[in-house]
Amino acid sequence: GYLGAPAVVAPGAPLAARGYAAPAYAAPLARYAAPVARAYAAPVARAYAPAVAATPAAVEYDPHPQYSFAYNVQDAHTGDSKTQHESRDGDVVQGSYSLAEPDGSIRTVDYTADPVNGFNAVVHKEAGAHPAAAPVAVAAPVAHAPVAVAAPVRAYAAPLARAAYAAPIARAAYGPALAYGGAYH
């Protein structure tokens, strides 16, 4: 049965006769369930092909490179005039370029480059076909007479007068109180 229920006392019994039962506790259950056997699937074996190493394409190497190029621009509309030519034989580069300067002179640069001497350039300048323009005489600056400016006058106007209005008169009306609805019974 239920343990620890309060004791029942007959009505009218003196207070000293009343009492309470000592608390009692049920014994713990000592039953344990057997472990459940669990089954797991074996890991899936996966087969992959070995990675194929990409072989780089063979880069052609020229132990004795050679090239030669040249260009020429003569534009009468814009006045652009320039030329260049260059050649390479192994590790030695030789070339030249020229251009027309704004004053009409021709600047020519002859250059060489090799592993022993590095880069070397020689600059030649030929006089132009037309002489440089003479400087234009500039007129002397004109001195302007100072202009007198009067200081501003500060003037303040009086504030505008506003019309005053009296507050509206509130009239109180006294009378019997209004009754709402009928009496409740």
UniProtKB/Swiss-Prot annotation:
<dbReference type="Pfam" id="PF00379">
    <property type="entry name" value="Chitin_bind_4"/>
</dbReference>
<protein>
    <recommendedName>
        <fullName>Cuticle protein 18.6, isoform B</fullName>
    </recommendedName>
</protein>
<feature type="repeat" description="3">
    <location>
        <begin position="41"/>
        <end position="44"/>
    </location>
</feature>
<dbReference type="GO" id="GO:0031012">
    <property type="term" value="C:extracellular matrix"/>
</dbReference>
<feature type="domain" description="Chitin-binding type R&amp;R">
    <location>
        <begin position="64"/>
        <end position="134"/>
    </location>
</feature>
<feature type="repeat" description="1">
    <location>
        <begin position="21"/>
        <end position="24"/>
    </location>
</feature>
<feature type="repeat" description="2">
    <location>
        <begin position="33"/>
        <end position="36"/>
    </location>
</feature>
<keyword id="KW-0193">Cuticle</keyword>
<feature type="repeat" description="5">
    <location>
        <begin position="139"/>
        <end position="142"/>
    </location>
</feature>
<dbReference type="GO" id="GO:0005615">
    <property type="term" value="C:extracellular space"/>
</dbReference>
<dbReference type="GO" id="GO:0042302">
    <property type="term" value="F:structural constituent of cuticle"/>
</dbReference>
<dbReference type="InterPro" id="IPR051217">
    <property type="entry name" value="Insect_Cuticle_Struc_Prot"/>
</dbReference>
<feature type="repeat" description="6">
    <location>
        <begin position="150"/>
        <end position="153"/>
    </location>
</feature>
<dbReference type="InterPro" id="IPR031311">
    <property type="entry name" value="CHIT_BIND_RR_consensus"/>
</dbReference>
<feature type="repeat" description="4">
    <location>
        <begin position="133"/>
        <end position="136"/>
    </location>
</feature>
<comment type="function">
    <text>Component of the cuticle of migratory locust which contains more than 100 different structural proteins.</text>
</comment>
<dbReference type="InterPro" id="IPR000618">
    <property type="entry name" value="Insect_cuticle"/>
</dbReference>
<keyword id="KW-0677">Repeat</keyword>
